[in-house]
């Protein structure tokens, strides 16, 4: 374990209007593992599932993917992510950090295309992979 890092897990959330990709770190914050993608029907259902994950996985922090354009401007979905962040802060007693997720979906698509050799991978798989990539990148940054 890296000196100075508290034992606990980090949950990554790749927010979407229909699906929410999730990944969680191991206790040493070294490896990201994908969790089942959540379907987004209503906020109450999502928050109850997230509360259960936070409890079961002993999550101490959430990193929330923040999609901004390549030029650095806030996108429409970026504004929705900011709203979702406020909702999470009101309902969970955890630090929630925004994480630039530019290109994670594109990287996910390329990985799946290479593995499956199909041009259109399922959206739920892309959401899950995006969360894994985002969290693994974050874990690499905090270990430096």
Predicted features and spans:
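Phosphate- and other anionic-substrate recognition elements at nucleic-acid/protein interfaces
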Residues: 2-11, 18-144
């Amino acid at each position: 374990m890296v000196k100075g890092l508290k034992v606990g897990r980090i949950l990554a959330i790749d927010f979407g209007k229909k699906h929410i990709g999730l990944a969680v770190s191991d206790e040493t914050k070294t490896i990201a593992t994908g969790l089942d993608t959540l379907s987004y029907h209503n906020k109450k259902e999502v928050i109850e599932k997230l509360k259960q994950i936070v409890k079961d996985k002993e999550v101490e922090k959430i990193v929330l993917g923040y999609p901004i354009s390549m030029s650095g401007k806030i996108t429409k979905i970026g504004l929705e992510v900011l709203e979702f962040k406020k909702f999470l802060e009101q309902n969970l007693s955890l630090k929630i950090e925004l994480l630039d997720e530019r290109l994670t979906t594109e990287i996910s698509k390329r990985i799946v295309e290479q593995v499956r050799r199909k041009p259109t991978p399922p959206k739920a798989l892309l959401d899950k992979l995006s969360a894994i990539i985002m969290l693994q990148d974050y874990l690499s940054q905090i270990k430096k």
